[in-house]
Amino acid sequence: MPRASECLSVEDTLRVLDGRTIHAFHIEGCGGGHVPNVLKMAGVPNVIGSSTNPTLPFGRDAVAEHYGMIVSAHDLKVDLPGDAAMARDRIRAGTMGAEDVLHDLGVIGITSSDAQGMGRAGETVRRTFAMAGKMKAELGPLDGEGSYGTEASGDDNERVLRYMAKLTINPAIAHGFAHEVGSIEVGKLADIVLWWPQYFGAKPQLVLKAGFPAYGVTGDPNASTDRCEPLVLGPQFGAHGATAADISVAFVAEAAVRNGDQMPTRRRRVAVRGTRGIGPGNMLRNARTGTVDVHPGTGLVSLDGEPLVSAPTDSVSLSRLYFL
C-alpha cells in the first residue's frame, strides 16, 4: 500500500484487489499505508488485517514518540514542509486508540512487528498481552461467546485465547503453514514456549523447537543445582551446530517443491497452501467483519456506526518492573 496515499486511496486499493485475498500488514492507527484512513480496510471480507506494535497498547507518550519515529524510519527532512506535514498527518490519537478496540473486538486478527522501521520485534508478545490488559480495564471481561460480559464471567480465558491466536495460529493460517505450526496438535512441529505463570508474556522459561530445547533459562554452570543464580536466558542444545537446521523447515511455494530439491539448505522443505480464498472469517477467535469508517476531519473511528474510543493509558501490564 502507498505509505501516504500518494498513489491510491483505500477505495482504489480495494477496487484493485477486486475481492482477492490479501494480508494487509499495516492495518493500524499510525503506521504505514493509506493516510488517514487505512483502518477502513479492517473488517473487509477479503482483507486479513494485522498491525505492528509501536502503538500497542495506546499509551500517553505514543503521539509524541511517533513524530520522531516516522521521520527517522522514512528518512524524512523536517525542514521540508511536505515531509513535515506527511509525518504529522500519520499521527492521530483517535485511530491509535481505535486500533486497540478493533483488536479486542476481533476485527484485527494478527499482531506483528517491523524491525528498525516502526516496530519492536522483541516485544510483540509482551505488547499484545499488555493491550489485552488495557482493554479489560477499559471494557470489562469477555464472556464465553467472546462478547463483553461482567465480572461474574469469572475468568479471562476468552480474552487470553483471542489474543494468543493473534500471535500463533492466525499468522500461520494467513501465510499458509498452519498445517505445520501455529497450534499444539498431533502432526505439527512441537514449537512450544513454556512460561512460569508470573512471567507469562515477559520472560519465557524454555523455548522448544521441534521438541528440542533451543533457548531458555540456564543457571551458573559451576552451581550444584540448576536454580542457582545468576539465571540467564540464552541458546541451548537446539541452537548450536547443525541442529538448528535439522529441526527447522523452509517454507516454499508448491511450485518450488515440484521443481525439485534445488535450495542450498539441509532444512526440510514444506509447501505453503491454502492462502487463496481465505479472509478474516478464517481467523480463529478474531473473525468479526464490519464497516470501519474514519472521519477525515476528527479522526474518529466507528465500526458499523458505533464510535470506537480508547484513552491513552498511563500504565501498562508487563512493563519495566519485569526487567529490572
Predicted regions and their residues:
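Active-site neighborhoods of metal-dependent hydrolases
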Residues: 2-164, 199-200
